[in-house]
Amino acid sequence: MSEAIAIAAELRDGSGKGAARATRRAGKVPGVIYGDKKAAICIQMDPRVVWAQISKTGFFTQLFNVDLGKDGKHLCLARDVQMHPVTDQPIHVDFMRVSADHAIHVKVPVHFTNELKSPGIKKGGVLNVELHEIEITCSPNDIPHEILIDLDGLEIGASIHLSDLKLPAGAKPYHVASGATVASIAAPTVARAETTETEAAG
């Protein structure tokens, strides 16, 4: 969780693919701000400003104050970034307005810690990740950049369920059952193969 980052932008004329191409030819990255029951507005940004943000971890869980100068500021979350297939540079950004007074749905990445302290992994166990991100409902001010899962002490066969996780205060899973498996530590591939062969022989 962190404070909103200010990001400079300008209004741009027109909408649609033609207007977006014209914006890119002028050396800017086109974008749009929508949501919060207000009309969508078309914007343009310096590509260096965009790249400086998308290269950071947690871009899609970071709050932004999109600053349009005399045209006002908009509290937003980035919802989508289109990248050029050859140059891998940003060519369009979608921002969604949010209100501090209303809960939102957001997908938060899952990261794991203390893998080397897991007896199961030390024995050759394999960490199988079922959910790489979890969608939650929470206040915009309480969005976590990541959900950390501690693997310390976990043996082969251990499973981590959504109900085991500590979410931020006020946050709830969205459209995911509390009993859903987030990750598990499976036996080494060789061991599983030997077990299968033994069962087949028996």
From Swiss-Prot:
One of its GO terms (cellular component) is cytosolic large ribosomal subunit. GO terms for molecular function: 5S rRNA binding; structural constituent of ribosome. Keywords: Ribonucleoprotein, Ribosomal protein, RNA-binding, rRNA-binding. GO terms for biological process: translation. It comes from the Bacteria. Signal peptide: none annotated. InterPro entries: Rbsml_bL25/Gln-tRNA_synth_N, Ribosomal_bL25/Gln-tRNA_synth, Ribosomal_bL25_b-dom, Ribosomal_bL25_C, Ribosomal_bL25_long, Ribosomal_L25_dom, Ribosomal_uL5_bac-type. Belongs to the bacterial ribosomal protein bL25 family. CTC subfamily. Part of the 50S ribosomal subunit; part of the 5S rRNA/L5/L18/L25 subcomplex. Contacts the 5S rRNA. Binds to the 5S rRNA independently of L5 and L18. This is one of the proteins that binds to the 5S RNA in the ribosome where it forms part of the central protuberance. NCBIfam families: bL25_bact_ctc (TIGR00731), PRK05618.1-2 (NF004128), PRK05943.1 (NF004612). This is Large ribosomal subunit protein bL25. It comes from Paramagnetospirillum magneticum (strain ATCC 700264 / AMB-1) (Magnetospirillum magneticum).
